[in-house]
């Protein structure tokens, strides 16, 4: 039922239900709270600008959702961190979304549909998405992963 209601809301142009009951920071907190546990700790440090356009909010929420889903499905991480804020690079102000984990890393595997979808949504807003190791390989060969999206404001 929830998925059907969500699909109807998206078709009607209302955006995700998570954004209809509170602001983006609250939606992100609810998402992180729902994903915490099961041997994994996720920290959230979210300071998005207050006046983001709805399409940008949707991309932020979907990017974090997919990154956390990838962590749960593929990384064997015990810790993750979601950081959202703004940076100014010269005359350009950017919204920065960084999701980092201490898991196995990508191991050079090709990009799947989840990452491709994230990249497509971010690039549609004129932004970039990078996926890199979070650190040098440890004794087990794990590198963790950092997914960073940058969207011009």
Identify the residue ranges that each predicted region occupies:
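ATP phosphate-binding glycine-rich loop and adjacent ATP-lid/helix-beta elements
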Residues: 31, 107-135, 142-150
């Amino acid at each position: 039922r929830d998925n059907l209601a969500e699909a109807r809301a998206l078709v009607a142009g209302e955006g995700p239900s998570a954004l209809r009951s509170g602001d983006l920071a609250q939606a992100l907190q609810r998402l992180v709270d729902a994903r915490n546990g099961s041997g994994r700790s996720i920290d959230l440090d979210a300071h998005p600008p207050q006046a983001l356009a709805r399409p940008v909010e949707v991309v932020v929420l979907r990017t974090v959702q997919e990154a956390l889903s990838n962590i749960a499905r593929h990384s064997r991480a015990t810790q993750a961190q979601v950081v959202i804020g703004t940076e100014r690079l010269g005359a350009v102000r950017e919204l920065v979304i960084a999701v980092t984990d201490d898991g196995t890393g990508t191991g050079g595997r090709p990009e799947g549909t989840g990452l491709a979808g994230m990249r497509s949504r971010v690039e549609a807003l004129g932004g970039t998405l990078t996926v890199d190791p979070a650190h040098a390989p440890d004794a087990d060969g794990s590198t963790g992963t950092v997914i960073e999206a940058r969207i011009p404001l």
